[in-house]
């Protein structure tokens, strides 16, 4: 049975699942779908074509599905799709997509978005991610599963962050980050591997292989792209080579990499 506060303003066109809780002074628009077990604390605003997955909990003063902050947006149909078991904390803002992108903003399952996180239009975020307070994502960003982003970090539009990465707090990131890397700084560059996450997700032999692979990729000569091509030619069937090297070769913004920065950090860790 759903529990809905009397002061909540809910469109009769909204779809409300079973066991949904809606707190005081929430505002829910026409094209909202709340699946079973969703919990809205007080003063949550949901607008646009917004779909919230099961058991997601949204805290006070979050605004989801509001008009994209893009001057090119002219009111075209777009969506915000949020998966299951997410925690979206106070004052988060998440915008839907635009015609200039994929017309959707998508967030997976089991993510934690801490207070004041901003997710702009056309972003695609995986599952099991943690974004600390004040993280700001510009439009069209792609983020894989199991990514942690430290507080007050800003990320440029169209950046891609692959699975298992860690972005240090107060970073400004303008380039792509391949799988399992740690980046830090303004501008942020790769400092080493996210060994903590790798130990959670991978076997020891795979961690060792990836460590050696990155050392080969990040040599001063040949270039990073040439190194990635060579690795794919030499190890065409290895899943980690495919994942990492394909990501590098598909990068349009370039990879957040400096040979000296990576080498120095790796020496310290060893």
UniProtKB/Swiss-Prot annotation:
Give a GO molecular function annotation for the protein.
acyl-[acyl-carrier-protein]-UDP-N-acetylglucosamine O-acyltransferase activity
Keywords attached to this entry: Acyltransferase, Cytoplasm, Lipid A biosynthesis, Lipid biosynthesis, Lipid metabolism, Repeat, Transferase
Give the reactions, separated by semicolons, that this protein catalyses. Answer: a (3R)-hydroxyacyl-[ACP] + UDP-N-acetyl-alpha-D-glucosamine = a UDP-3-O-[(3R)-3-hydroxyacyl]-N-acetyl-alpha-D-glucosamine + holo-[ACP]
Q: Which Gene3D superfamilies match?
A: Hexapeptide repeat proteins, Udp N-acetylglucosamine O-acyltransferase, C-terminal domain
Which InterPro entries does the record cross-reference, listed alphabetically? Acetyltransf_C (IPR029098), Acetyltransf_C_sf (IPR037157), Hexapep (IPR001451), Lipid_A_LpxA (IPR010137), Trimer_LpxA-like_sf (IPR011004)
Self-association or partners: how does it assemble? Answer: Homotrimer.
Functionally, this protein is described as follows: Involved in the biosynthesis of lipid A, a phosphorylated glycolipid that anchors the lipopolysaccharide to the outer membrane of the cell.
The name on file for this protein is Acyl-[acyl-carrier-protein]--UDP-N-acetylglucosamine O-acyltransferase
Gene behind this chain? lpxA
